[in-house]
Amino acid sequence: MARVKRGVIARARHKKILKQAKGYYGARSRVYRVAFQAVIKAGQYAYRDRRQRKRQFRQLWIARINAAARQNGISYSKFINGLKKASVEIDRKILADIAVFDKVAFTTLVEKAKAALA
């Protein structure tokens, strides 16, 4: 059986990993074995955090809506319930944007929600 020389493939694989680890601190960017572990872990963090980002943004939007709603004398849960009853279909992302940048429009939404609850 012919001898298989794998130097070229190994070099390419190492180069690929070290390229991915570029910018990492110390041995993590220079030593293949350490860099490989760092790249694998970074991938795990990235995978996890792509999912967490969606949750975190929703939390942020809810916190902003709640703060603005309470300034207008209504709690977040009652505000959302009022909007549902008034059949206002604005998602939390847009509501949070309105709460931050257009206080007058948000106040009118609060009034609609209060009217629907009454």
From Swiss-Prot:
GO terms for cellular component: ribonucleoprotein complex; ribosome. GO terms for molecular function: rRNA binding; structural constituent of ribosome. Pfam families: Ribosomal_L20. Keywords: Ribonucleoprotein, Ribosomal protein, RNA-binding, rRNA-binding. The keyword tRNA-binding does not apply. It comes from the Bacteria. PROSITE patterns: RIBOSOMAL_L20 (PS00937). PANTHER family: 39S RIBOSOMAL PROTEIN L20. Binds directly to 23S ribosomal RNA and is necessary for the in vitro assembly process of the 50S ribosomal subunit. It is not involved in the protein synthesizing functions of that subunit. HAMAP family: Ribosomal_bL20 (MF_00382). Belongs to the bacterial ribosomal protein bL20 family. This is Large ribosomal subunit protein bL20. It comes from Shigella flexneri. The lineage of its organism: Bacteria, Pseudomonadati, Pseudomonadota, Gammaproteobacteria, Enterobacterales.
